[in-house]
Amino acid sequence: MRIHYLLFAVLFLFLMPVPGEGGIINTIQRYFCRVRGGRCAALTCLPRETQIGRCSVKGRKCCRTRK
């Protein structure tokens, strides 16, 4: 029965995100950006766009054209 605790701890360590890289979080944020009709911009939004959110932990912006 103790082996289950060890396996759980090892599995937990492998699933923890590396600091600075939120793999699962970034994927979810990109998905919701696209659902809201936006796109992920690396640095800034284009002049005819407005920022509606973020696409990653590192600062990519979710931009959508102004209505």
Curated annotation (Swiss-Prot):
Identify the main location: secreted
Could you give the subunit structure recorded for this chain? Monomer. Homodimer.
User: Which positions form S-S bridges?
Assistant: 33-62, 40-55, 45-63
* Biological classification of the source: Eukaryota, Metazoa, Chordata, Craniata, Vertebrata
Put simply, this protein is called Beta-defensin 1
Please report which protein family the annotation says this sequence is part of: Belongs to the beta-defensin family.
Function of the molecule: Has antibacterial activity against Gram-positive bacterium S.pneumoniae Serotype 14. Is also active against Gram-negative bacteria M.catarrhalis 1857, and non-typeable H.influenzae strains 86-028NP and 1128. Has antifungal activity against C.albicans. May have a role in maintaining sterility in the middle ear. May act as a ligand for C-C chemokine receptor CCR6. Positively regulates the sperm motility and bactericidal activity in a CCR6-dependent manner. Binds to CCR6 and triggers Ca2+ mobilization in the sperm which is important for its motility.
Q: Which organism is it from?
A: Chinchilla lanigera (Long-tailed chinchilla)
Which tissues express it? Highly expressed in tongue, nasopharyngeal mucosa and skin, and to a lower extent in the Eustachian tube, lung and trachea.
Task: Please indicate if the UniProt record lists Disulfide bond as a keyword.
Answer: yes
Q: From the Swiss-Prot or TrEMBL record, what is one GO molecular function term?
A: identical protein binding
In terms of InterPro entries, this protein maps to: Defensin_beta-like (IPR001855)
